[in-house]
Amino acid sequence: ADRTEVLAALPEAGVQLVVDPGCDVESSRAAVALAEAFPHVYAAVGIHPESLIEEEEPTVAVYHGDWAAELRDMAPLFGDERVVAVGECGLDHHWPVPRDAQLAMLEGHLRLAAELDKPVILHDREAHAEMYELIRKYKPKGVLHCYSGSAEDAKWIAAQGIYLGFGGTCTYKNARKTVEALQKLPLPTAADADLDNAFVCLGYASE
């Protein structure tokens, strides 16, 4: 379906608010433009860790820039009243992404979120220990989307004031740990409706 038609139909379907996260400068600007076009859509602005990938991959863009400079270039976007969060940002050790650069970039986002008093949209793939350490250090509020950790860790994260997102990976046959975490969390501590619901569980659009 056409994205514009889908977004326009959301209020009638009972969806009150949507937050569209950016993953780089271009998509962050697009998210702000989309938020300005629909009263029930808001934007988040940030740089996804996969943007730092050094080699061509079929599912990610290749980053050849300076993330700190790009984050500074995004500064005017955070002044827009339609921008309600920082992100998507985080750590991803599944792809060949430089770890030092990822950590530095995530800390830059977390410091910015604290300065702006905005929540963050966090990405954590195969980087639980480092992510949890930064949560302890910066104490952000927001959501950790597409959660894949243990039930014990999920309870701790929720106790820090961070919502947990559970995406399409919950349907995987080997996702017992994730399903257990979901079952042991009180709602509305758990919620996720980002692109990963479709992206990581490819099927038909109607599904």
What are these regions (language model features)?
Residues 1-207:
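Mid-domain alpha/beta scaffold segments of enzyme catalytic cores
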